[in-house]
């Protein structure tokens, strides 16, 4: 499972001209399920994401997590993160989980996030979304938890 997280001062998702999710300062997270992913990978990735230290402490070092700063988390499904771009000029999405599994894992991830974090907003699986954000830093990290083989 993959999460591309960006530290933001604000972020929002619009579907059909309606804002369906928005946060202030926190993390905007593009989330992708890959073939072979299970709730085990989702749990591990969520734990890492909520504990990942990307916010400054009093000394200006990245020593605080989104949990520590009570920041928002905006979760946006993004299957293209699993693209295989090794050959040619057209990406292959074979590494991505099938849509039914991906939706199930996204929903699971969101449910777990809501239980573990104070402020969670989401995009809409399968929708044409317009995502807006103000990247703070910029600070962007790729987190990945691969299934055990």
UniProtKB/Swiss-Prot annotation:
Enzyme Commission (EC) number: 3.1.1.96
GO CC terms: cytoplasm
Subcellular location: Cytoplasm
Main location: cytoplasm
Pfam families linked to this entry: Tyr_Deacylase
Keywords annotated in UniProt: Cytoplasm, Hydrolase, RNA-binding, tRNA-binding
GO biological process: D-amino acid catabolic process
The keyword Hydrolase belongs to this UniProt entry's keyword annotation: yes
Motif Gly-cisPro motif, important for rejection of L-amino acids, residue range(s) on this chain: 137-138
Molecular function in Gene Ontology: D-tyrosyl-tRNA(Tyr) deacylase activity; Gly-tRNA(Ala) deacylase activity; Ser(Gly)-tRNA(Ala) hydrolase activity; tRNA binding
Gene3D superfamilies: D-tyrosyl-tRNA(Tyr) deacylase (3.50.80.10)
Annotated domain remarks: A Gly-cisPro motif from one monomer fits into the active site of the other monomer to allow specific chiral rejection of L-amino acids.
Family named by the database record: Belongs to the DTD family.
Quaternary structure note: Homodimer.
Alphabetical list of PANTHER family matching this protein: D-AMINOACYL-TRNA DEACYLASE 1, D-TYROSYL-TRNA TYR DEACYLASE
Cited function: An aminoacyl-tRNA editing enzyme that deacylates mischarged D-aminoacyl-tRNAs. Also deacylates mischarged glycyl-tRNA(Ala), protecting cells against glycine mischarging by AlaRS. Acts via tRNA-based rather than protein-based catalysis; rejects L-amino acids rather than detecting D-amino acids in the active site. By recycling D-aminoacyl-tRNA to D-amino acids and free tRNA molecules, this enzyme counteracts the toxicity associated with the formation of D-aminoacyl-tRNA entities in vivo and helps enforce protein L-homochirality.
Full protein name: D-aminoacyl-tRNA deacylase
């Amino acid at each position: 499972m993959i999460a591309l997280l960006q530290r933001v001062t604000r972020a929002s998702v619009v579907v059909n001209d309606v804002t369906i999710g928005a946060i202030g300062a926190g993390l905007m997270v593009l989330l992708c399920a890959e073939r072979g992913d299970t709730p085990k990978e989702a749990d591990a990735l969520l734990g890492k994401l909520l504990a990942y230290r990307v916010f400054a402490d009093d000394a200006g070092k990245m020593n605080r997590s989104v949990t520590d700063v009570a920041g928002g988390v905006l979760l946006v499904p993004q299957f293209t993160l699993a693209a295989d771009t090794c050959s040619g000029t057209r990406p292959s999405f074979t590494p991505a989980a099938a849509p039914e599994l991906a939706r199930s894992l996204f929903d699971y991830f969101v449910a777990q996030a809501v239980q573990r974090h104070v402020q969670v907003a989401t995009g809409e699986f399968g929708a044409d979304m317009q995502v807006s954000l103000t990247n703070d830093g910029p600070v962007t990290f790729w987190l990945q938890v691969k299934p055990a083989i």
